[in-house]
Amino acid sequence: MKKKGIIFLLCSLLCGCAAAPTYETLGGDIHQAAISLKEAVVSVPQGATEMAMEQGTYWVCDDFDMQVQILSGGDLGETVSALSGLDVDSLTVMTSAAGEMVRYEWVWTAMSEAGQMLCRGLVLDDGAYHYCLTAIGPAEQGEKLNSQWNDIFSSFHAV
C-alpha cells in the first residue's frame, strides 16, 4: 500500500511536466492588411447629367457642376492642390471625423470665363485612398448653392 501511495504521489507531481511548446517566427516586418478600395456614394440632384471621366464621375446640374474622384491616399496637400489648383496652406481646411475616416472640407473662389465662381471641396481619407467631392457654381448664387451643397456634401460617404 505504501508503494502505491508513493507511485501515486510521484505521478501526480510529474503530470504537469510536459515540454513547453516551441513557437516559430518568420523573419521580416509585420505588414498591416491593405485597406480595400471603397465605393464613393453621393446624392445627385434630380435632372443632373452624368459624364464618366477617366478619374471619376462628373455631373452637370442646373446651377452648378460637381465631380467625384477617388485618388491615392497619402499627402493631403497634393490632393487639395490637384482638386482646387491652390496650395493647401492658402486655404482653411476644416477637419472632422467621419466614422473610421477623416473628413477634410474647404471652400474657395476662382475666376472663369463666366465670372467669379464659388467652389467647395471635400476629402474623406481612410489612410489608403482619398474619396473626393468637388462642386463649382456662380458666386452670385452663393446662398442658393450653399443650401443645395449642404445636402449633397452631407450625403457623401464611402462604402
Features from the language model and the residues they span:
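Short, well-ordered strand-loop elements centered on a beta-strand within folded domains, enriched
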Residues: 77-78, 129-133
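Short, solvent-exposed secondary-structure boundary motifs
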Residues: 38-52, 81-86, 109-115
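Short beta-strand-to-loop capping motifs
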Residues: 72-73, 135-137
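Signature of long, low-cysteine stretches enriched in small and polar/charged residues
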Residues: 84-128, 136
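A short acidic-to-branched-hydrophobic micro-motif
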Residues: 59-82
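Short, isolated positions in well-ordered beta-strands
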Residues: 42, 66-68, 101-103, 117, ...
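N-terminal targeting sequences that direct proteins away from the cytosol to non-cytosolic compartments
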Residues: 2-64, 127-129, 136-159
